[in-house]
Amino acid sequence: HATLREGFERDGSEIAACGCAVPGVDLGSVLLSARCVLRGGALLGVSSIRLLLDDWDPNFEALCEMATFAATGNAGPEVAVDLGAVRYLPPILNPGKMMYAAANYGGHIREMVAAGTAKTDEERDNMLDRDKGRVRPYTFLKAASALSGAYDDIVIPPDTTKVDWEVELALAMGRSGKRIPAEKAMDYVAGFMTTNDVSARDWNMREDWPTLRTDWFGGKSHDTFAPMGPYFVPRAFVPDHTKLRLTLKVSGETKQDGITGDMVFSAEEQIEHASTLITLDPGDILSTGTPEGVGHASGTYLKAGDVVETEVEGLGAQRNNVVAEIVD
């Protein structure tokens, strides 16, 4: 019997049966255990979405066939999962790399400058300069251990008082590539996810290291600071990834409301940039930046008792309770 679930919408969600995560198929009205559906098929032995991505093109074709087979009533009742007994896990567990875009929406850049992120006029001018002839995308790494599910708690450590939110469109690679040109970048993408790049601003901008200042590890990689999912939506089911609405609410109040087409550097340009530095592999995650409306702009931060609702249009919505870390 299924007890847990990761995410894979339309052609998949990830569930854990008997405590082990396995692929699942979400058909809207019913969730199917792919472990049962696939046991005699081409995907035999595949135990996670992460493994599906290693050979994504044929696996995606097989998943479509499986979904059609099940949707027409050919799947037996033993494959149905009790939705009341599942827990959403991150769609992709143990990704090789998690890459995030910094300062990639004009409104977000301006609000961060206004909040005093730039300490000098020169820094201010540099932050506001987004002439692509002179400026490259800014990408940082986030620890995969920060991943959490779409309905898991966001845990605030006792070492920070400025935990902030950032709704983002995340994508997952389905092919390996190096020096991928932007015009071919989407050929390497398997699908998309909703994510929240939770950030500790007082760690991200270190006053105790004035010559270095920025600490991306300390600001971004705390446990639970990367809620992902609930679904992994294959690229074929996203008609235009540049026209997706991104919204985030804190305790019912809308804080962010943007559109993916407002990115400074497109997802394709970010893939091109990242792949000039490092080989991108199946299962790698790239999160593409956040629009304006973060808490730092107004000096407002998450606190225990808040509820964060994060959504990217067509990719599913998250709902995370904010709790304080219990320290023994």
What are these regions (language model features)?
Residues 157-159, 274, 296:
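Short, solvent-exposed loop/turn positions at domain surfaces
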Residues 10:
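Cationic, low-complexity basic patches in intrinsically disordered or flexible, solvent-exposed regions
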Residues 93, 100, 281, 303-304:
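Residue-level recognition of short, solvent-exposed, well-ordered loop/turn junctions
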Residues 150-153, 263-271, 288-293:
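Short, structured beta-strand/loop micro-motifs enriched in basic residues and often containing a Trp
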Residues 230, 254-281:
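Glycine-rich active-site loops that engage anionic ligands at enzyme catalytic sites
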Residues 3-7, 16-42, 226, 292-328:
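Charged, cofactor-coupling segments
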Residues 143, 149-150, 280-297, 310-313:
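Conserved metal-binding segment of the jelly-roll/cupin
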Residues 3-7, 15, 22, 44-250, ...:
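Active-site microenvironments in enzyme catalytic cores
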